[in-house]
Amino acid sequence: MNFLKSFLFWQPKKDWLLWFEQSLLRKKILIILNYVIWVFFFFISYLLIRKDVNIFWQILIATIIAEIFERFLKRKIYWRRPLFEKNDDLPPGLVKKWYKTGSFPSGHTIKTVYFLLFIIQYQVFSIPLFLSIVSPLLFFRILIGFHYPIDMFGGIITGALIWLLSKWIILPIFITQIFKTIFNFIFFID
């Protein structure tokens, strides 16, 4: 039982967050690594919607459910983020409000999982490439003390459940056509 707990709540001995905060360049890298995944998800969303405009609604519903579920769980299943256990401060450039609740489940992991499952479902991006981009970013969040491994496992399960709920959503054709016209206009698609 101790082994399981030490695995699920593992943190590196070195305080990597403190190391990143010791130079201006590393601080900037920390902020970039925290937010770059959202730019990548925007790109994946674009590829998915371009393949089938109805996917927009699936992604939208998945994201709304994810935000509600994540916020609810982070208030109910509360353990402090590892960085606060080490008495580290949240780096400038991150939204403090988002980090003051519990760390379970990982919101980044929730979104990663449902985007991965949408990619598998609609085949718009290389799965190995997707995993090679997001896996280091997720592990980085454990390394710097934003999450424990158990938070990631909770995110995997939650993300899969959210995908199961949202993958069946199909809106009426006239709504989808209106959105397709807007999407094509914004992204200059003929």
PLM feature spans:
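N-terminal transmembrane-helix/juxtamembrane module of multi-pass inner/ER membrane proteins
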Residues: 1-41, 70-100, 180-190
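Juxtamembrane/transmembrane-helix boundary motifs in multi-pass membrane proteins
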Residues: 22-26, 46, 50-54, 58, ...
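Hydrophobic alpha-helical transmembrane segments of polytopic
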Residues: 33, 59, 63, 130-133
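Alpha-helical transmembrane segments of multipass membrane proteins
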Residues: 41, 65-70, 74, 137, ...
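Generic transmembrane alpha-helix motif of multi-pass integral membrane proteins
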Residues: 43-47, 115-118
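Interfacial segments of alpha-helical transmembrane regions
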Residues: 44-69, 152
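Active-site-proximal helix-loop elements at catalytic-domain edges
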Residues: 64-80, 117, 122
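Membrane-embedded catalytic cores of phosphoryl/pyrophosphoryl-handling enzymes
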Residues: 87-190
